Amino acid sequence: MKEGVAIYPGTFDPFTRGHEDLVRRASLLFNKVVVAVAESHGKAPIFTLAERVEIARDVLAPFPNVEVTGFDGLLMDFLRQRDARLILRGLRAVSDFEYEFQMAGMNRKLFPDVETVFLTPAEEYMFISATMVREIARLGGDVSKFVQPAVNERLLQKVSLKR
């Protein structure tokens, strides 16, 4: 039986096969999954917010109960606007758990009704991080195993412009 709405926030710079796998599996668990692409003022993303939203929409088009939207500001404000109470996060390793555990606690302090649900990635995606994918691409490495072909093409265009 599927449950309500899950908000899956992130920078998604770039949107990886690991992100896609998590959304695919979440779409089987929840009535609706909202992929909330963050503006991310504290980071220097390769792709603009609009580009990251477009890329995620393209990758996730096969999933009818998935919506992709951008947002700026506090995640808790976004949840309130959406009348949502569930945050979906992926956990790849123990190092992810410590950070995500702290964030879940802080989010609950800001919005006591919120719950955070963690999914672990499929084994083949456990090591993929968008940060590593960006760095490998910047250094001229092949990231085609970690992202969809259209994402790889756009990533190659971006990094070649920055060289």
From Swiss-Prot:
Q: Name one GO biological process term.
A: coenzyme A biosynthetic process
Keywords on this record?
ATP-binding, Coenzyme A biosynthesis, Cytoplasm, Magnesium, Nucleotide-binding, Nucleotidyltransferase, Transferase
Describe its assembly. Answer: Homohexamer.
Molecular function (GO) terms for this protein are: ATP binding; pantetheine-phosphate adenylyltransferase activity
Where is this chain's protein located in or outside the cell?
Cytoplasm
Q: Which gene encodes it?
A: coaD
Q: Which cofactor does it need?
A: Mg(2+)
Name the reaction it catalyses.
Answer: (R)-4'-phosphopantetheine + ATP + H(+) = 3'-dephospho-CoA + diphosphate
This chain belongs to which protein, by name? Phosphopantetheine adenylyltransferase
E.C. no? 2.7.7.3
Q: Which family does it belong to?
A: Belongs to the bacterial CoaD family.
Q: What is its main location?
A: cytoplasm
- Record organism: Aromatoleum aromaticum (strain DSM 19018 / LMG 30748 / EbN1) (Azoarcus sp. (strain EbN1))
List of residues binding substrate = 11, 43, 75, 89
The pathway it acts in is:
Cofactor biosynthesis; coenzyme A biosynthesis; CoA from (R)-pantothenate: step 4/5
Annotated site location: Transition state stabilizer: 19
Looking at the UniProt record for this protein, which Gene Ontology cellular component terms does it annotate, in alphabetical order? Answer: cytoplasm
